[in-house]
Amino acid sequence: MKCYNPSAFVPMAVTLVTVIIYLGVFIPLLIIQETVPSAPDDPTLYNGLNLTEAWLDLQSLSDGYHPFNSRKNDDVRNWLLKRIGEILDHNQIQYSTETESATISETQIKSDFDAEAPESVPSPSNSNDGSAERYHEDLRARKESPAVTVFNDLRSNYSSNALTSIGVKGRKLGISTYFEGNNIICYVRGSDDEEGEWWKTGSVNSKGKVHGKGGVMVNAHFDSVSTGFGATDDGVGVVTALQLIRYFTTPQNVPQKGFVALFNNGEEDGLYGAKAFLSHPMARFVHTFLNLEGAGAGGRATLFRSTDSEVTRAYAHAKHPFGTVVSSDGFSLGYVRSETDYVVFRAEGYRGLDVAFWQPRSQYHTDQDDAKHTSIDSLWHMLSASVATTRSLTKDTGNTFLGPRGDDKVGKVSNGKGSDGVWFDIFGTVFAVFKLRTLFAWSLTLLIAAPLMLFAVSYLLNRQDKFYFFAGSIKAKGPEDEPISLGGWRGAFRYPITLIITCAITFGCASLINKINPMIVYSSPYSVWSMSASLFFSIFWFIMAGCNFVRPSALQRGYAFMWLFVFGWIILVAATVYEDRFKISGGYLFVFYEAAIFLATLIAIGEQFALPKKSTYVENSQLDHDGNQDSHHQAVMGTDGANGADEANASNEAGQEEDPEDNVNDLAVPHETTPLIGGGAPTQRSSISTTFANRYRQVVPESYDGPADHHDKKGHKKHPYGGEQDWSAKLPIWTWLVQYLLVGPFILIVVGQVGLFLVAALHQTGTDGSPLLLPYLVVAVFSILLLLPVTPFIHRLTHHMPTFFFLVFIGTLIYNLVAFPFSPNNRYKAYFQQTVDLDTGLNKVTIVGIEQYIREIIAYIPSAAGQTINCEENPRIRSGLSFCSYEGIAPRVVDNVVDGIPPEKGYTDWLTYNVTRVPNENKATFHISGLETRACILRFDDPFSEFKVHGGAKTEERWDDVPDSGSDQIKLWSRDWNKEWKVDVEWAVGEDMKPGEEGRTGRVVCLWSDANERGVIPALDEARRFSPDWTSVVKLMDGLVEGSKRFVV
C-alpha cells in the first residue's frame, strides 16, 4: 500500500487539510452564532447580583403591553419606583427621593447615631479630644449626603423637530415635537464625588463645572411598543439597570465615580425620554454611558456601536464579549435606518457604548418579545457584560474621560479626547480593541511595503536566474539548438478568468432567487448560504481542475496568490481611503486578508530559490535531448548494449542508486517493436553512447543528472507532479501547507464571524421595506470571501468534495425556489393601523407590507370579506411597502358608548378642539383635548414656521423648534391623561400676500395605543385571531388608532 507524505501537495493531503480547517472553524462559529453562554448555576455567584431576582423582575415587567400612551405604562413606572426602593432597603442604603423641584428626604435605615457608631469610636461623654464632635459631624454629613438619590423626574421636557423619519425618502419638511418626560433617575454617589446636593448649584444648562471625576450612566427605556411585551426591548436592559443599582449599593462594590441609572420613558416613539433627560441637572454629571437596547428578541447581546476605542476597552473586560465594528459602520454609512438612545447621548458629547440584542428580528416588536421567547442565559449575557463594563468605567479615575474635548465643540461635556476605534471578538471569548489610526498605519504600510518586498524578492530571483514566473522559451548555447520552453506562462490567466466567471454565476443565482422567491432568506438563511457557497466551490473546482488536467502547471498556486494579492491590494486602497476620510473601521477585514495573502505570495515566490538556474536547466535539458538522440542512433545502427551495460555497472559501483525499472529499460536490446524515439522512460537519460555522436557531444558537468532526475536527501528520485514542468520536481513539497495555514484559520474566523453577523442582522429586514436583494448579495460576497482561501489549492482536491457540494447546490436551489418563506417560528410582520374620521364616523384599517403577502393575510380576515382591497405606496411613512386598506370594525378606545349602540355615536367626544385666528396676522391658537390619551398631533397641509405650547418648559437651545424649511406636524406628548393643549402656531407670509390674508388647513389628530384589553380595538383583535399562523401583526405608527377632525383657519 502506497503511503502519502501528509505535507505533500497531493490531492489526499490537500483534501484532508481543507476539511479539517473549514470544519474546525465553522462548527465553533455556528455554535457561537446560535447559542448563548449558560448562566451560572448559582444565581448569587457574584456578590451584589441576584439572577433569579432579575428574571422574576423581567417576568413582572413584561406581563403586558406598556407603550408610553397606555395606562400600563404608568403601572410599570410605579413598579420601578417600588423596586428601586426595595433594592435599596435590602442593601440598607440611606437614600433620598426628589420629585419635581421639591426634595423629600426619606431615610431608609435607622437614624440612631449611637446604633450606627462603630465600637472603635469613643462616645461623646468620655472623650475630650474632639473626636466625638468630628464623629457627629461626619454622621451629619452622611445624613445630608445620602448614598443614593432617586429622581422622580416630572419636569424635564423636550421640544424640537426632526427633518426625517424612519423609512422616509426625500422628506424636506420637519416634524416638530413637544414632549413632557417622566423619567426615573437613580444616582449612586461615588467615593470621589462631591458631598451635598451639588446638582442644585448653577443653571441647568451649565457645562462649566465638573463634579468629581464625572459620572458613569447606564440607560434603558421602560416603555414598549403597543404590540410587543418588551421583554428584550427593553425589559432585559431595565432589569439589568436594577441589578446594577443592587450591585453598586452593596458595601463591597461602592463605585469610585458616581453611577447613574436612567430609566427613560418614550424611546419607542422618537427617543424622547433620552432627549428629555438632557435638560435634567444630572445630565451635567455624566461623562460616559452604556446604553442597553433590544433590536431582536434574545440570543447574545452585541456591541452595536462605540464612540471611541478608550471606552470600548471597558467592554473588553466582559467574559463573553460579542460584536464587531462593522455594525457601527452600518450606522455611520446610513445603511441602518433605525436608531437608539445612543445617538442622543453621542450628540450631547458623552462617550459610551450601545449594547443590544439583535436577533431574531421576526420577534422584534411582536407579541413574541416576551419572557417565554427569551432566556435567562440571554439576560445573563447582557447583565454580566454590563457589570464588567460599568465596573471598569467607575474605577477609571484618571484623565481618560476628563479634560478638553478633542473636537473643541462648545457646550459639550468636557470628557477628554477619544480616538476612533476598531474592535471585534474572536469566538465570543477574546475581544480585540485598537485605534483606527493604528489600522490606518497598518493599511498604509501594507499598501507600500508589500508590493516593494515582492518586487525585491522577484528581483533577487531574477538576478540568480531562478524567476520562473512569466518565463517563456530560452534558446540553448548551440547555434543549431532549438529553444527550450520553461512553461512559465502556463496557468498565468486561468485564475482571474475563473474567478470572474464563478462570481458572475454566484451573483446571478442570488438574483434568480430574489426574482422568484425573494423572501426565502427570511426563514432559511443557512439554505441560502449553502446554495451560494456550494455553487461557487463546485464551479470554481470544475474550471480550475479542468484547466490543470488539460495543461498542468506547477505555477498555478503561485499565480493564484499573485492575482489574489492584486485584487486585495485594490480593495485595500478603497478601505484605506474610507479609514482616513470617513472613519470607517470595517476595513480591518481586508487588512488582515491582504496581509495573509501577501505572506502566502511571498512564499510562493520565495520557494523558487530552491530551483536550479534557468540557464542550467536549459543546458541540462539540451544535454538530455542530445543523450536521447545518441541512444536513438545506436538503436538504428544495431549497436549492442555492452558499452551501456559497462557504464551502468560503473555507475552502480560508484554508489549510484537506480530504479529497477530504469535498469530494465536501459539494458533492453532494441528490436523491431522498440519505439523509434526515446528507447527508455521519457524522464530518464539514456546511458547508451553512439558511435556517430562525438562531433555533437558537449562537455557534461559532473553534477548533471538530467532535468528530471532530481533526488531527495535519501537518494530517491523526485518527479514533477502530474505532467507539470520538469523543473518543478525541485520545489519544496511543504510550502503549500504554510500558505494554507496563513490564509485559512484566522482569516476564516474573522471573516466568518462578520458574515454570519451581517446575514443574521439583515435576512429578516425585508418586511421593514429594506431592499430584498441586499441579504442575498451579502451572502454571495461572504461566500466568495470565505472560499477564496481554498481556491489556490482547489485543483488538488479530490473530486469527492465538489461532487458533494454540487449535489448540495442542486438540493438547496430547488428548496430556495419553491419553499414557502414563512413559518410560525419565523413569522411575517404585517403593520397595522386604524384611522377614524371623527367627523363622518368612517374608519379604515390599513395593513402594510409586501402586497403579495398582505392580500393573502387580509383574505383571512372576516370583516374584509367582499370588500375591494385598495393597495398603494406611501413613502412618506414607510418606503418599499404597500398600504392595503379596508373598512374595519369600529374601535372602542373611549368607553363612552353603552352596549348595543354603535360606537360611532360617541366619536364626537373622543376629540374636541377649538381654533382662534389672530386678526391681521398669520397666527392661530389651538385648544385640543382628547379622552383616554396623552398624545395628539396637529397636521397641516402646508408648512408653518413657529409654534409655542402654553405652560410648556423653556425650549432647549440645542434644538430648533421648527427647521428653516418649516414643519407640517406638531406632535404633542403629555405626562398627564386627558390634558388640554393650548398651542400657538404661526406661518410665513407668502409672496405678494399680506399678514392675515392666508390661512391654513389640516387635521387635529389624537392617538390611542393601549391594546391590553380585548375588545378595545376589535379590528386588531380580529387581525391577530384570524391571520395565518405565519403572520404577526405589529404597530405601524405611534398610535394603533388615530382619530381626527378637519380644521380650517
UniProtKB/Swiss-Prot annotation:
<dbReference type="InterPro" id="IPR053975">
    <property type="entry name" value="PFF1_C"/>
</dbReference>
<dbReference type="GO" id="GO:0005774">
    <property type="term" value="C:vacuolar membrane"/>
</dbReference>
<feature type="binding site">
    <location>
        <position position="268"/>
    </location>
    <ligand>
        <name>Zn(2+) 2</name>
    </ligand>
</feature>
<feature type="glycosylation site" description="N-linked (GlcNAc...) asparagine">
    <location>
        <position position="50"/>
    </location>
</feature>
<feature type="topological domain" description="Vacuolar">
    <location>
        <begin position="579"/>
        <end position="585"/>
    </location>
</feature>
<dbReference type="Pfam" id="PF04389">
    <property type="entry name" value="Peptidase_M28"/>
</dbReference>
<feature type="active site" description="Proton acceptor">
    <location>
        <position position="267"/>
    </location>
</feature>
<feature type="topological domain" description="Cytoplasmic">
    <location>
        <begin position="548"/>
        <end position="557"/>
    </location>
</feature>
<feature type="topological domain" description="Vacuolar">
    <location>
        <begin position="762"/>
        <end position="773"/>
    </location>
</feature>
<keyword id="KW-0378">Hydrolase</keyword>
<dbReference type="GO" id="GO:0006508">
    <property type="term" value="P:proteolysis"/>
</dbReference>
<feature type="glycosylation site" description="N-linked (GlcNAc...) asparagine">
    <location>
        <position position="157"/>
    </location>
</feature>
<feature type="topological domain" description="Cytoplasmic">
    <location>
        <begin position="460"/>
        <end position="495"/>
    </location>
</feature>
<keyword id="KW-0325">Glycoprotein</keyword>
<keyword id="KW-0645">Protease</keyword>
<keyword id="KW-1133">Transmembrane helix</keyword>
<comment type="similarity">
    <text>Belongs to the peptidase M28 family.</text>
</comment>
<dbReference type="InterPro" id="IPR045175">
    <property type="entry name" value="M28_fam"/>
</dbReference>
<feature type="transmembrane region" description="Helical; Name=5">
    <location>
        <begin position="558"/>
        <end position="578"/>
    </location>
</feature>
<keyword id="KW-0926">Vacuole</keyword>
<feature type="glycosylation site" description="N-linked (GlcNAc...) asparagine">
    <location>
        <position position="914"/>
    </location>
</feature>
<feature type="transmembrane region" description="Helical; Name=8">
    <location>
        <begin position="774"/>
        <end position="794"/>
    </location>
</feature>
<feature type="binding site">
    <location>
        <position position="233"/>
    </location>
    <ligand>
        <name>Zn(2+) 2</name>
    </ligand>
</feature>
<dbReference type="GO" id="GO:0008235">
    <property type="term" value="F:metalloexopeptidase activity"/>
</dbReference>
<dbReference type="GO" id="GO:0046872">
    <property type="term" value="F:metal ion binding"/>
</dbReference>
<feature type="region of interest" description="Disordered">
    <location>
        <begin position="114"/>
        <end position="135"/>
    </location>
</feature>
<dbReference type="InterPro" id="IPR007484">
    <property type="entry name" value="Peptidase_M28"/>
</dbReference>
<feature type="topological domain" description="Cytoplasmic">
    <location>
        <begin position="1"/>
        <end position="11"/>
    </location>
</feature>
<keyword id="KW-0479">Metal-binding</keyword>
<feature type="compositionally biased region" description="Basic and acidic residues">
    <location>
        <begin position="622"/>
        <end position="633"/>
    </location>
</feature>
<keyword id="KW-0472">Membrane</keyword>
<feature type="binding site">
    <location>
        <position position="233"/>
    </location>
    <ligand>
        <name>Zn(2+) 1</name>
    </ligand>
</feature>
<feature type="topological domain" description="Cytoplasmic">
    <location>
        <begin position="607"/>
        <end position="740"/>
    </location>
</feature>
<feature type="transmembrane region" description="Helical; Name=4">
    <location>
        <begin position="527"/>
        <end position="547"/>
    </location>
</feature>
<feature type="binding site">
    <location>
        <position position="221"/>
    </location>
    <ligand>
        <name>Zn(2+) 1</name>
    </ligand>
</feature>
<dbReference type="InterPro" id="IPR053976">
    <property type="entry name" value="PFF1_TM"/>
</dbReference>
<feature type="topological domain" description="Vacuolar">
    <location>
        <begin position="33"/>
        <end position="438"/>
    </location>
</feature>
<feature type="transmembrane region" description="Helical; Name=9">
    <location>
        <begin position="802"/>
        <end position="822"/>
    </location>
</feature>
<dbReference type="InterPro" id="IPR048024">
    <property type="entry name" value="Fxna-like_M28_dom"/>
</dbReference>
<feature type="transmembrane region" description="Helical; Name=3">
    <location>
        <begin position="496"/>
        <end position="516"/>
    </location>
</feature>
<feature type="topological domain" description="Cytoplasmic">
    <location>
        <begin position="795"/>
        <end position="801"/>
    </location>
</feature>
<keyword id="KW-0482">Metalloprotease</keyword>
